[in-house]
């Protein structure tokens, strides 16, 4: 592979693994690791057809050793330079079947298209019960909606969850297919 291609791939990897994982459709675990297959799929979405061998070459030849592969070469992460928080010191937790997200009804269409994104935060915040989700929703102006998230299914599909000390459930991103179609509304 030529140097220009290696640099392009390296820049995309840096962006996805250090700064904006969701842009490549990635969900980093607490320590910054993500499945190599997910990274390859994300690179394809950005016009870079990359094989495992290509990825291993970029990792091996990076002059700054920006990336690391796990011992079994199944996962990859950036070694440093994250603008996203990758280690909260929280152990991954198995969520309940459903979690809830309270928000403004005006963003519902976008959520149904794109899923729940963390925005400026490092994680999407979810509630374990409807009452708490409604309290969160009421912090926003206008009509509210409480979305139900198939959290256990997400977890079973390999998407990590954490629970903070104050009981808020955290995950990197909730893809739209995990947001149930029916919800509770309030004026």
Name the predicted role of every residue range.
Residues 1-187:
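Eukaryotic, polar/proline-rich low-complexity intrinsically disordered regions
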């Amino acid at each position: 592979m030529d140097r220009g291609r290696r640099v392009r791939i390296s820049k995309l990897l840096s962006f996805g693994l250090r700064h904006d994982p969701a842009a490549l459709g990635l969900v980093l675990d607490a320590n910054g690791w993500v499945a190599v297959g997910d990274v390859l799929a994300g690179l394809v979405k950005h016009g870079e057809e990359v094989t495992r061998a290509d990825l291993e070459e970029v990792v091996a030849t990076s002059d700054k050793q920006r990336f690391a592969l796990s011992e079994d070469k199944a996962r990859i992460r950036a070694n440093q330079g994250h603008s996203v928080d990758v280690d909260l010191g929280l152990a991954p937790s198995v969520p309940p079947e459903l979690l809830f997200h309270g928000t403004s009804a005006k963003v519902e269409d976008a959520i149904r298209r794109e899923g729940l994104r963390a925005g400026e935060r490092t994680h999407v915040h979810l509630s374990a019960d409807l009452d708490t989700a409604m309290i969160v929703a009421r912090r926003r102006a206008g009509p509210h909606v409480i979305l139900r998230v198939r959290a256990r299914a997400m977890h079973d599909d390999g998407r990590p969850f954490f629970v903070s000390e104050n009981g808020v459930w955290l995950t990197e991103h909730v893809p739209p297919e995990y947001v149930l179609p029916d919800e509770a509304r309030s004026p």
